[in-house]
Amino acid sequence: MPRLQQKWLNSRECPTPRGEAAKGLFPTKDDPSAHKRVSPSDKDIFILCCKLGIALLCLGLLGEVAVRARRALTLDSFNSSSVQDYNLNNSENSTFLLRQGPQPTSSYKPHRFCPSEIEIRMLAKNYIFTNKTNPIGRLLVTMLRNESLSFSTIFTQIQKLEMGIENRKRRSTSIEEQVQGLLTTGLEVKKGKKSVFVKIGDRWWQPGTYRGPYIYRPTDAPLPYTGRYDLNWDRWVTVNGYKVLYRSLPFRERLARARPPWCMLSQEEKDDMKQQVHDYIYLGTGMHFWGKIFHTKEGTVAGLIEHYSAKTYGMSYYE
């Protein structure tokens, strides 16, 4: 036997993991029924299908029980007479809420109440009838009008709104705590309606708005519209008495402060500007300093003419 063939036979005889794993899958001379034993029989498949069917049936029954229990609880907690009163009431609120906008064809049933609809109306009764400007009430009105959102979405939004309202209340009650905390610093503290003020220098500051000891002097007071530049070469303006960098203003504010509008000038300033224009047009006076910067041929000729005419007619300031 050739050497290569001998080597091939030896390699076939030595056991490999792949060969060991595939031992029971194929019929061999020693075990002809191996493949029949591994594959499941029809009986096994039938039992598995039965188990799956029973499990699905149990899940469906559990879901149905949960839905019925929830519906029963909802109806118990909300007595049906008030539902009818709410529905048939001709007051401003009920007409404002109900039968406006398209009704959904799939979920809405005229002859019976959906639990979610009852819950929405309960919430609407709580929120809207007490205060129409309540954001939660407005949200519910929107929802009842177009019914585009699911009740769970609405409910999470209501929870968020309620949390926001609670936070607002908490923040307003914590002013006293802020005052107590700031009093320990030794500064003079004043309590406002919505916040606390601390006296630094001769001015009152909200905590966190103090930007360093810049002093208002008559020369340094920034122009209200165009602003000034501070020591860091940042342009700044005063907003409600605070130093605000020009770049941190919103776009419309920056646009409004680009130049002082005409209406902000006093009547004397307006008249003075008109007089300057009038003098320049009719008398040729004023704005002579530009001649020191821009020298043009036409300007020189005009200056000479003006000079000689002034000597003749005496309409210049030179005499």
Curated annotation (Swiss-Prot):
Its main location: membrane. Residues 66-319 are extracellular. Residues 1-39 are annotated as: Disordered. GO terms for cellular component: membrane. The keyword Membrane applies. Keywords: Glycoprotein, Membrane, Signal-anchor, Superantigen, Transmembrane, Transmembrane helix. Glycans are attached at residues 79, 89, 93, 131, 146. This is Protein PR73. It comes from Mouse mammary tumor virus (strain C3H) (MMTV).
